[in-house]
């Protein structure tokens, strides 16, 4: 871990050649010659570029030039952050953070279709349990640091892998590890049902009033969601007692959210609670997003109020501070039928990176740091626009695990036409749609093994070609 993007070479007499052993990420290279006793001549200086081989079956193109540029920038970023595992960046750390890898796996599944590689990353992620029962935030490493949300992200990545591939063998084999993680965090619940964690309680790079010894509201909802998923795995494996326990604890967690973490003075859920300070002073989009996305609210009225805050953010709420957390915000907005808003926001925020003539996505947005634009200029968690474009703008919805079935639907976005390809375990789906003369024309090439539901396409001119 560290900024290891330089090297020293001590010259001998005469012509010689040298190739560095360490992988270095860069856009520009600076050569410095120190203390020469005579002129130094460079005959050749170059870079040897290398990325992991990929199926790379996905593609996208549209009549929106800026959106195309952003898609290419994000896809290139993802490719540069793929080594023997997903890494956060090719320069600053080159580390396999298991929370970052969740977003990378969603991107790769929809854009590249490297399913064996997704499985490999999940298996490597399981080794994070060797450092600490909380799961280390990155692995393999001797730096012991845990972020609870990263452990829960590893579990949701397993769930998405199953949905992409219909392969349940991985979750079955990893169930003992999942059970161990769930049991540890259940042990962190206090008498009232709060997940009181003493650790790095990070949700986002933003000024949330949460502490290292804290019940974090969004984290509480995500843990309840993971317990429900683990209960399903337990039932499938014949561990009925585990399933009952996990579901009971998930309900306790949600009741705690409802009874303890609601701030009646602002009619919103607090970002957290600490034994020293009580309820947090801040309320945020981050908390509302995780509560909504992971079904953390029991009370129907509080759920309605929270959805209203997502539809129209109050001024006093803290906004998402990083490309990382916008992944979750965008998922909720798309579920509300606001894909058009999501794509326009992507063009605004990622378009700002393009204005600086960048070819890759930054870790944070311009303005986050006072004295620099960003820390990492090529960061995998910032490549999620490729995922949203692929999954939602093409009008193809996965209707069954493993893409055994898909559902077609018209797309409400500011595009005149777009085309693209989606990888599946049955083969590639090719899509092209356009709006001409007030009519939407939709052309689909789809493997014969995939069922197609086109009930929502009655107003469109539809051609389905089986391959």
Kindly label every feature range from the protein language model.
Residues 5, 11-14, 83-85, 132-153, ...:
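The feature captures the catalytic groove of carbohydrate-active enzymes
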